[in-house]
Regions:
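Non-heme di-metal
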Residues: 1-152
Length: 152
């Protein structure tokens, strides 16, 4: 992903490269906060932050398509590759989070809520990419909980 995005940035007019634009480091901060707890890491990095990328990508792509500029349309294509790969990353996180909860005899839904609170995970807001989340292994109960929490 880095290589695709960096090459695209470098192809744009002006001097653009990795690091020349402002970006957040929320994923890295969460990785540091959960470094001592693999269950928390699986719950909050792939299942929360990377999954949020699944949600955010379609609206970003829609805005880029509206621009109609070749560079914007190239970015849409790059985001297609990234979101497809991210479904796999989130699926791996879902698998291992479920396995870890089973090994520790934890209820995955209840434990997720506790971990999100304890580690100050960002509150997830719509829109949600339900199809990508299902492809990534989120079960109906998790999707219903996500919808309920976002609504209330």
């Amino acid at each position: 992903h880095f290589t695709l995005l960096r090459a695209h940035l470098q192809s744009l007019p002006g001097e653009h490269d990795y690091g020349s634009l402002v970006a957040h480091d929320g994923l890295w901060q969460m990785a540091e906060r959960t470094a001592h707890d693999v269950t928390a890491r699986m719950a909050l990095v792939p299942r929360t932050l990377e999954a949020r990328g699944l949600d955010a990508t379609p609206p970003i792509q829609a805005k880029l398509r509206q621009l109609g500029h070749p560079a914007a349309l190239k970015a849409v294509d790059i985001l297609d590759v990234i979101v497809r790969d991210e479904v796999g990353h989130v699926a791996i996180g879902n698998h291992w989070y479920g396995w870890l909860c089973q090994q520790q005899q934890l209820d995955p839904l209840a434990h997720y809520r506790e971990l999100a609170r304890r580690y100050r995970a960002p509150r997830l807001r719509p829109p949600f990419n339900w199809v990508a989340r299902e492809q990534a292994g989120f079960v109906p109960a998790e999707l219903q909980a996500l919808q309920s929490e976002a609504s209330g």
